[in-house]
Each structure stands twice: as structure tokens, then as C-alpha cells.
Amino acid sequence: MPFSLDLEKLIDRKCRVAPTIDPARTWLHVTDMQVTCTDPKASGYLKGGYGIPSGDECVVSCNRVIDRCRQEGIRVSWSMFGVEPDGSDAGLFLDKVRFWYPNGGSDAKWGDPESEIDPRMHRRPEEPVFKRPVPSAFFGTMLNRYLTSNRIEYLIVVGLSTSYCVRNTAIDASNYNFRPIVLADCTTAYDPYEKTAGYVEALRNVQGQYGDVMTSDELFKMFDEAKHTHAAA
């Protein structure tokens, strides 16, 4: 089921870090759009439902945002989550993954085909890809350096999963003094028992303390408004 939640009824969005946007100082980061989460046949597939998109549907919505951002001159980076095959860098992740996948599965291990970025994604070869074994795309990577070197102020975050890597990346973006924007229709979460609870709570946490939560259509409207403002100046 595609995204169909009413954010205004679920999240208090009055306080914003990005009431307007400057595309020239904006960056798009695509988090963990890997086969394990996006392929309906994969071990970690995110099924969605109850108004939130599936991993497969996020491929479509994320590509739509990627294409529009490129039209606005916004650069794109990517990240992938995974651990070494022997688990030597996994830390506490292995303790948690046993709960997620009680029947096993090697989807999060480098070298497994499921760990690769979904080939349907509109990724260009020259765009940076950051690999790490922890939730935040900033931790142990060069993402912060790319953003600061390009004088970025606004960081759009899309991808998987909402309550894990997207939320943690948005938090670290705020910690580094960027203005994070998470697109609710371009992410989804693991909620095997709680329906939309983890997804909504993660978005509330981002909006309440770190950044802004909106839909891709709302973002595109901001792009259009920025053009009108620039033309009138």
C-alpha cells in the first residue's frame, strides 16, 4: 500500500527547522535502499501496510525525489548498512538481528547479493556511497566532510529504515548543525507486531527534536516557492 497517512493528525509540525529551502545549499542522502529491504522475496523485506509504504514502493518514491532533486541541481549521496561476513565489526547488531530474523539470514553481510543497492535505484556511478556497520550514515564516513565542503545547510534524508538508519542519520545531521528533512512517503520501518507504531514514533522524534518531517509533494512545493522567491528578488 502506498503512503496514505495524514501527517497533520499524527505529528505536531508547527516548529520547523526548514520553513523555506535553498536548493543551492541542499543535499539529498539516500539511506540503505538495499535489496534485502526492497525485494519482496528477500529476507529482510519491509512489507509496509496500514498506510505506510513497502520497501518496494519506496524504490518508486525515492527515485521520484532523486530525479526532482537533480533537476534542482541538488547533489546526491548514498549509504549502505552491512557487517563483515565473520561479524567482527557487528557489535551489538547481531544481538538485535536475531530478533528481527529468528530463522537466520545473511542479508546484512557484505558480499551477500541482498546487501547490494537495489539495481532499480537511479544511482549514478560518480555519486559517493558510504558503507558502515552502524545506523548513522555519518558515523565513520566522509558524509560530513562532503556536506561542509559544499557549504550545505539542508539535508534531505530518504530510504530505509525509518526508526533505525533514517532516524539516526537525521539526528547526527542535526548534531552537525545541518537542517534535516525526512520524507515520510520515502521511508518505512520494521513493525512486525506494532503496525505503524515504530514508524510514526521515529518521525515524531525527528520532528519534535531534530528536523522536519514532510512528504515529497510538500518538498516539491518548497522548491517551486524557492524559484518564485528567487525570480522576484
Segments predicted by a language model, with ranges:
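Active-site-adjacent betaalpha module
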Residues: 1-27, 35-36, 64-72, 96-233
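A short alpha/beta connector and helix-capping loop motif
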Residues: 24-26, 41-69, 74-80
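Short acidic/His/Gly/Ser-rich catalytic and metal-binding motifs that mark active-site loops
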Residues: 36-41, 87-88
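Short, well-ordered beta-to-alpha junction loops that form the rim of enzyme active sites
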Residues: 79-82, 160
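Short, electropositive alpha-helical surface patch
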Residues: 82-102
